[in-house]
């Protein structure tokens, strides 16, 4: 009866630790180009311009540039094409979705005191999608290393008595898996070894169950071979969103000052499925499937300070500071494993939901300097430069031994990165034509784990008076080396060459 119930209701296991790593940290520290079509048409080079709802998300002084109260809403069609190489295998995957990536309103109040130098004040509220996590790809090829090394590597680094992996009298396999995960002495790493054993991938050197409780040496049931055919499927979904309250003011219509108070929220799901097969007649394990479902939820806070100065009537200078974002993150993990010689009850393990203790993540702050020149009624050109030190990313509490190790890895692997954006606009009466280019340097010192991102944009807009309609097309490319598992015994990675294409439409109204 209990087994039947487990088919419908998962067991909750309070895990001790999940293997957060540098990749997880980088995921929540990067900013994508999101926002209005005008903003995207200029590749986000808006720090000294203002007068656009998404410009306010770069420099909070930008809302005071508005002459009238303003509201906008943006829809985007996001497309990703991944060319994936895994050893001798090559595959192309595509993903497409449509979403609401920006909406907001700014309210402008003019000072009725004509003798005051503070000419107007602005308040705005806006939602911006900072990151879109929707992606999927498939890698396949022949590897000289079997997935058995993933499990054996853990046993070689940590003495795990075989008795820990055994079922107690009357204990179900899913209960043992959950108990190991919630044990302060074992946790996630020993759970992986448990999976490897009950899937038939590894065995203790001493096979005598009456004497092998203290055995800590293990061997593989996969025969050594020159190559193993492997497939790895990756699918992720979700977003990183930001809701901002903005306050800004204008001094003599020459200096604009502003502040943003930001509430952040993360909703991220990742599914990976690994498959391996070999035809060696001496191999006991011939087919292996290993699946992981990760769900991440988080919330955070940050603030921004900004200023825009009119050096002349045509030349503008902008400066802004983004504080670190302080996140509180919760994670849940479901695992599944199988093989041709796995225990018949192995499937019940996928009914266990491992719930891990929440942790804090502090992302790095960012400085942005901007310069823009306005050619009267005929157009403009704008340039933004941003600097962010990714090595300042921190898992917290820093007193935690595991997080201290990961923070050292962050410091060793990540570096300071610059972002360059340039954009221009030509105005032909009611019609505006736009274009831009951006370069985002890799946050990694090696430049290979995640390469530089380079992209361009085109856009147009038409003003119907108080109503404006804008459209933008932007495309960017980036390479990456995706390591399948954070495990030195099985360090295999897939090479990705990704192209991101977006079409955005914005409707904007002056109130």
Regions found by a protein language model. Give the residues of each.
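Outer-membrane beta-barrel porins/channels
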Residues: 20-34, 39, 108-511
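Transmembrane beta-strand segments of Gram-negative outer membrane beta-barrel proteins
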Residues: 21-46, 63-81
């Amino acid at each position: 009866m209990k087994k039947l119930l487990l088919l419908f209701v998962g067991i909750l296991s309070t895990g001790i630790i999940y293997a957060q790593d540098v990749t997880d940290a980088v995921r929540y520290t990067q900013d994508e180009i999101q926002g209005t079509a005008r903003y995207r048409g200029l590749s986000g080079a808006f720090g000294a311009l203002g007068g656009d709802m998404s410009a306010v998300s770069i420099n909070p002084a930008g809302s005071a540039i508005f002459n009238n109260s303003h509201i906008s809403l943006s829809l985007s069609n996001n497309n990703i094409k991944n060319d994936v190489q895994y050893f001798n295998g090559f595959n192309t995957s595509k993903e497409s979705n449509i979403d609401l990536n920006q909406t907001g309103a700014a309210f402008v109040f003019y000072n009725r005191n004509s003798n005051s130098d503070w000419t107007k004040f602005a308040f705005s509220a806006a939602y911006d999608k900072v990151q879109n996590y929707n992606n999927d790809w498939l890698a396949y090829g022949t590897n000289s290393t079997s997935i058995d090394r993933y499990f054996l590597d853990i046993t070689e680094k940590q003495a795990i008595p075989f008795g820990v992996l055994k079922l107690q009298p009357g204990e179900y396999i899913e209960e043992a898996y959950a108990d190991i995960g919630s044990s302060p002495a074992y946790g996630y790493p020993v759970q992986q070894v448990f999976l490897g054993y009950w899937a038939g991938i590894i065995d203790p050197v001493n096979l005598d169950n009456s004497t092998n409780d203290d055995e800590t040496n293990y061997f593989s049931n996969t025969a050594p071979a020159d190559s193993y055919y492997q497939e790895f499927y990756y699918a992720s979904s979700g977003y990183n969103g930001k809701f901002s309250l903005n306050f800004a003011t204008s001094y003599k219509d020459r200096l604009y000052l502003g502040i943003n108070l930001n509430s952040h929220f993360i909703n991220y799901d990742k599914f990976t499925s690994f498959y391996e097969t070999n035809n060696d007649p001496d191999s006991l394990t011939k087919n292996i499937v290993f699946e992981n479902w990760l769900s991440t939820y988080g919330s955070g806070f940050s603030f921004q300070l900004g200023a825009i100065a009119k050096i002349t009537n045509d030349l503008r200078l902008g400066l802004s500071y983004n504080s670190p974002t302080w996140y509180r993150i919760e994670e849940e993990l479901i695992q599944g494993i199988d093989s041709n010689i796995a225990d018949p009850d192995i499937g019940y393990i996928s009914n266990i939901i491992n719930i891990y203790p929440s942790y804090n993540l502090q992302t790095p702050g960012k400085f942005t300097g901007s310069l823009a020149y306005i050619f009267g009624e005929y157009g403009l050109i704008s340039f933004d430069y941003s600097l962010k030190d990714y090595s300042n990313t921190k898992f917290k509490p820093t007193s935690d031994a595991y997080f201290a190790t990961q923070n050292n890895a962050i410091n060793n692997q990540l570096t300071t990165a610059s972002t360059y954006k340039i954009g221009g606009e030509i105005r032909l009466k009611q019609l505006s034509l736009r274009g831009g280019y951006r370069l985002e340097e890799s946050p990694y010192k090696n430049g290979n784990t995640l390469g530089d991102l380079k992209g361009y944009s085109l856009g147009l807009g038409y003003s119907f008076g108080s109503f404006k309609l804008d459209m933008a097309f932007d495309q960017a490319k980036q390479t990456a080396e995706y390591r399948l598992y954070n495990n030195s015994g099985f360090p295999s990675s897939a090479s990705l060459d990704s192209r991101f294409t977006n079409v955005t439409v914005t409707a904007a109204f002056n109130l």
